[in-house]
Amino acid sequence: MVIRSYLDKFCTIVKGSSYNTGLNPISELFYGRNTSRILFHFDHSKIKLMVEDGTFPDMSKLKHTLHITNAGSLDFTQLHTKESNSIGNGMKKRATSFDVIFFLIPKEWDRGKGFDYSKTAFNENYYDTKNPHNASRLVSTDGCNWFQPRNGYKWPEYGIYSTDTLSKEYDKFSSDEGSSIIIGRQHFDIGNENISLDITDIFNKFISGELDNYGICAAFTPDFENVFDTKAYTQQYSSEKYYDNYVGFLTDKTNTFFEPYVETKYDDYISDDRANFVIDKNNK
């Protein structure tokens, strides 16, 4: 049996920015001139109910996989194209050969009603203060951003957790010790791959109540987020500081059928071997 739980909240937070992007159909991860992280949430209550009512009697047979579609073109000629940035008036290019980590969000957060990542030369006319209908038309600082999970509350550290904190947890995750925060990692070869992550252990802990479900955050690994720290970054990456490297994913606000979801599979396979008999042996 296969069940889909569609993601119900998305938001991209940008380092040092109070802008909210909860209604944008594209969520972009950046490193280089800017740093961003992606927050998302899914409701596990439907699967929990099916466990409680006996539809899924054995949780060990459940497998949960996160699926989020890459917004990048499959046209390889576009992979090297530099584009106008979503943040400020700089440039961006497709990131390639990188890892993305996934960690648990520790607090309730609101997706907000913002759209744009920042004011740029392309959208500045929307914010003409002389026209009351355009003022702050697509910009909002309410709800989730780099500094807060929702109005009136603060993250444990800016950006949920600092890059330094994630770096320490990433070392634990990569060792036998394990991390209590980071739950997964996915490598991207070209940069246009979709997210496909096994989150079975965490999802089952949401069902059992061992963990509270506040959602998951995706980020570049700490060495990429430290791109401006020349001591922490090798010389081969020095050119990355002059523009943003990005990868984009379709959110639940996409107007396509590529909505992000968690796929739950229950292995209820029963083997019928009644046609197989062995002489001189009890056959059950």
Regions from the PLM with identified roles:
Residues 1-284:
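Secreted, disulfide-rich extracellular signaling modules
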